[in-house]
Amino acid sequence: MKTNVLPAENSAQNTKATNAVLGKDVMEAVWADMALTELPSWVSDVPPNWGTPARGKLSANNWRVICTVHLPITLIRLWGGDDTPKPWRDFLENFMDLVCAAQIANLRSISKEEIKLYEHYIFRYVTNFKSLYKHSKVKPIHHAALHYGDILRGFGPAHTHGGAFYERYIYSMQSMNHNMKFGM
């Protein structure tokens, strides 16, 4: 049975005022779907109360699982129907462009064709972001994401040059003795 959770008619004005797309009803639908979703053993569980003040901050891996697994499951169910009003269908398509780009950017191996596909999705995401979220500003991370195809072309898959690599490098540098002082 399809449940179509869309904001009330006057919520469009509230959405612009609060900069929020996911309201309480949508969040409750996500949490309900999470309780019914069986994840493979290699996918980390996320806190069931994410998105609430009581929960606090989430790890990058929590956000990855939420945005690439849980939100797509619920948002496609809620906003993916032919009868979904245009703005909400557009929000879904824009979010799915971001999900596709993120999935491609995090592949363990990557081809030239996949890099072009990444560039297609991220360009469409940023372009449509500007028209869908007129009240929001394009951030430096959006600009950086548009250049990430060049980074993938030059340095290969993200895991070879991602944060974990630099964390290990920084740790090894801090472990060395520099001028008789630790951590310099």
Which ranges hold each PLM region?
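A structural signal for the principal folded core domain
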Residues: 1-184
